Amino acid sequence: MRRLFVIGALAAGLVVVGSGEAHAQGYRTYMYVPGIPGSAVDENHKDWIEVLSMSQGVMGTKKSVACSDLSIMKYLDQAGPLLWVAAALGQVFPEIRIELVRPGLSNGVLYDIRINNAKVTSSQTSGSSELPAESVSFSYQSITLTYNIPDAKGALHPGVPQTISCQ
């Protein structure tokens, strides 16, 4: 029984250590929406929107492709009201860029997402005693995804862009 407890405690410790590793590496996500400045201060992403989390998806068959909205969570910032207006007016953005970066990697951009002919489909604000957050969703006609491959020395090697047309 004691041996089982020790094994369980070791496994739990590994899960805790493992789950903190990605966070400790300091990944950051930024989004560029033309004409809508954000509050990012990163030297390579000045005035971009800082993204807290993101979700995207695609479903396909041999005959059709359906892309789900790309949704982000962000803290309330100067971009918020402008994104609300873009949603209300049905404004189309030729290209929106999202970059997942990790400091210390040469060129820095690990994952590059570009959505084309994008529209804000919803924008919602929620909050508590801490800084309010906003959830913003985008529809788009096509998406290009590029995962740049890191090596053991921290250098990134160009990935192959993959483009999906969403109908």
Predicted regions and their residues:
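Positively charged n-region of N-terminal signal peptides that target proteins for export
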Residues: 1-4
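Bacterial N-terminal signal peptides
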Residues: 7-17
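Glycine-rich, low-complexity intrinsically disordered segments
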Residues: 21-167
